[in-house]
């Protein structure tokens, strides 16, 4: 389960931002997860609930998760299409010359402080 490592990285980033901005308590964090990333949202939130117990600055901090749709670009016909629905082969022209544009990311979108 690599979600725990992801949570530790998120916590490190939050601690760094809090220190730079003289923040002592974080109320919530919003995370964007691409729908074809390898991060499983409910594993991430379970790990989050466990990990924040060890960080006073994050006591009671809620993690909000937003899923970003995966979009693929076709080099053959120059169109975008939904990756999960159609896979790697372009539904417009049948080309296999396709590239994932978005949907594999994991971002800290927003941090709410007290």
Listing of model-derived features with the role each one plays in the protein:
Residues 72, 88, 106:
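Cys/His-enriched microdomains
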């Amino acid at each position: 389960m690599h979600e725990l490592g992801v949570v530790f990285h998120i916590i490190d980033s939050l601690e760094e931002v809090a220190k730079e901005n003289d923040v002592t308590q974080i109320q919530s964090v919003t995370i964007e997860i691409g729908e074809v990333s390898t991060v499983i949202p409910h594993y991430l939130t379970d790990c989050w609930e466990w990990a924040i117990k060890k960080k006073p600055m994050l006591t009671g901090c809620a993690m909000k998760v937003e899923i970003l749709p995966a979009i693929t670009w076709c080099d053959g016909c120059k169109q975008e299409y939904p990756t999960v629905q159609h896979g790697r082969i372009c539904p417009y022209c049948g080309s296999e010359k396709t590239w994932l544009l978005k949907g594999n990311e994991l971002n800290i979108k927003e941090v709410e402080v007290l």
